[in-house]
């Protein structure tokens, strides 16, 4: 325990660690605030002039105007009828034919509902959404019964021809059966905000990789490790203390910043929006059985597992590195490696490799969030595996394996010494 406290104190007292932790905390607040600036709203004042709002004011205005609560088939029908009435009034063929002031006054509150209805009733063979006048009141009453059919067509469009396609279809349908219906909706937390949670995860991983990289390598660089390895407690006990201290500091930083992001985001966008069904935010056929608020916490914990696996790899690399520069280079490359592999290596091999790398699931297009909301499957031996499930199932295995390799590597040095 004394070794652990001393190591904890040693790492925390370095100027670089303090600076990086401060940057991480600032990033959490900035990443929560930035999506707020993307929100806009326009309305007419008492004189008939257009008034535009952005940021927090726009959020509050939209929350006052837009539909919220449980989205029943009757509410869907009400939205369609409002749209079709205005379309007929202006002989419009698209939303661009509607005067802006009319759109914001009569239709904007219904826009999310109508967009999702068009997605649900898209052509099963082409994926093309129908025109506004192509939908009927009966369609709106059958909105929820249409969703499994839409899901089936999406899987067919994206996965047909792959060995194991039928299994992918079955997995998707089983997951979607667990989604609670009817959906709920309240304007607030946006898809952009959730994207920034993913970006924050990447940035925190990079910062913490920099913190963890010198934990073992700095002693090797200065020669202190040669002395430590010859002492009574310089073997497994010291290795365990260093590993525990590094995990404690980086883990606490990641969780603190993640919680700050969630609290600030929900405070800015409004806590009511945390009850919105994930399907209303991304796609009506998303497989996640969560509300937005639940997804925020699920993503924090899930990304934390992957983050922990990456830190374990960085520490393992630090054990074998002879100087800080080598350890830092390996650490940074390992964080971005899954993104590069995902973009450069084609086919099933590239998908599996980007998934199984230590930082698999952290990044941009390869990020866990997008694997959870999209229909990305991995195929092997005629079987289909939901990629998000593979990412989450493999993370604990990576952690145990990499921590074990780090300890084993340090013990080997002890024997050599």
Indicate residue ranges for each PLM-predicted region.
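Secretory targeting signals
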Residues: 26-76, 82, 139-219, 240-320, ...
């Amino acid at each position: 325990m004394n070794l652990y406290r001393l190591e904890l104190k040693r790492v925390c007292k370095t100027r670089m660690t303090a600076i990086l932790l401060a940057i991480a905390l600032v990033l959490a607040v900035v990443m929560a605030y930035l999506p707020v600036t993307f929100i806009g709203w326009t309305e007419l004042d008492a004189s008939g002039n257009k008034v535009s709002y952005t940021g927090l004011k726009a959020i509050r205005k939209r929350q006052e105007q837009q539909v919220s609560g449980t989205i029943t088939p009757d509410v869907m029908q009400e939205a369609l009828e409002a749209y079709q009435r205005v379309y007929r009034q202006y002989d419009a063929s698209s939303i661009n034919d509607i005067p802006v002031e009319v759109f914001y006054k009569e239709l904007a509150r219904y826009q999310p509902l109508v967009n999702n209805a068009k997605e649900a009733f898209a052509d099963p063979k082409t994926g093309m959404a129908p025109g506004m006048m192509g939908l009927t009141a009966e369609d709106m009453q059958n909105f929820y019964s249409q969703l499994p059919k839409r899901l089936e067509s999406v899987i067919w469009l994206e996965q047909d021809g792959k060995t194991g396609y039928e299994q992918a279809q079955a997995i998707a349908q089983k997951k979607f059966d667990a989604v609670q219906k009817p959906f709920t909706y309240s304007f607030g937390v946006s898809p952009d905000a959730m994207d920034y949670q993913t970006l924050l995860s990447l940035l925190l991983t990079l910062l913490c990789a920099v913190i963890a990289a010198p934990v073992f390598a700095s002693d090797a660089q200065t020669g202190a490790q040669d002395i430590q390895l010859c002492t009574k407690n310089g073997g497994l006990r010291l290795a365990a203390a260093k590993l525990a201290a590094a995990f404690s500091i980086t883990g606490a930083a990641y969780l603190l910043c993640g919680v700050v992001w969630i609290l600030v985001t929900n405070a800015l966008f409004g806590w009511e929006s945390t009850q919105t069904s994930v399907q209303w935010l991304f796609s009506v056929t998303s497989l996640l059985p969560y509300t937005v608020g639940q997804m925020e916490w699920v993503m924090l914990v899930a990304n934390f597992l992957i983050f922990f696996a990456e830190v374990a790899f960085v520490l393992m690399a630090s054990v074998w590195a002879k100087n800080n520069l080598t350890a830092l280079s390996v650490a940074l490359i390992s964080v971005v490696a899954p993104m590069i592999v995902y973009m450069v290596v084609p086919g099933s091999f590239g998908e599996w490799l980007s998934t199984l790398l230590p930082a698999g699931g952290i990044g941009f297009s390869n990020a866990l969030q997008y694997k959870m909301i999209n229909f990305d499957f991995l195929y092997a031996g005629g079987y289909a595996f939901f990629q998000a499930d593979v990412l989450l199932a493999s993370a604990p295995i990576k952690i145990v394996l990499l921590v074990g390799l780090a300890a084993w590597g340090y013990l080997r040095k002890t024997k050599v010494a």
